[in-house]
């Protein structure tokens, strides 16, 4: 799984990098960006599964970043990190479909707990998608088999029918 943190304060990103054991969580790649534009550049070159970002940043804020990123990457799980416990932000995050909302400063174990839940959600979604694809493949295979049997039923040679089964 690939995760990205976006915050305009480098010290916050450094603290997260030092305080969270990403390897223990099963996270393969962790990227950091200090602004929305850099985050979008990274997402265009590296698939990101989970995006955690600050709300208030210069230029494009975290809410705008999430809105834009979700349009391009609808499977992206988004989590807001903010030092503002503003109810309006919480409402907007719900409307945007954010997975969670973490008020900073948050202990690392709280962030890790949210990441664990988000990772579990990713794994479950991937399993559902794989099952769906297998089901589609099986359905297509069954239809192809039925088509071959039906075509061979109309042939005059009965060995053709037996060979299609």
Q: Where in the sequence are the language-model features?
A:
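Receiver (REC) domain active-site loop signature in two-component systems and cognate sites
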Residues: 57
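Acidic, metal-coordinating helix/loop segments flanking the phosphotransfer/catalytic sites
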Residues: 32-50
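Acidic catalytic/metal-coordinating carboxylates
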Residues: 35, 61-64, 82
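Interdomain helical linkers/hinges and coiled-coil/dimerization scaffolds
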Residues: 103-165
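Two-component/phosphorelay signaling modules centered on CheY-like receiver
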Residues: 10-31
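Short amphipathic alpha-helix used as the core "switch/output" element in two-component signaling
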Residues: 41, 63-73
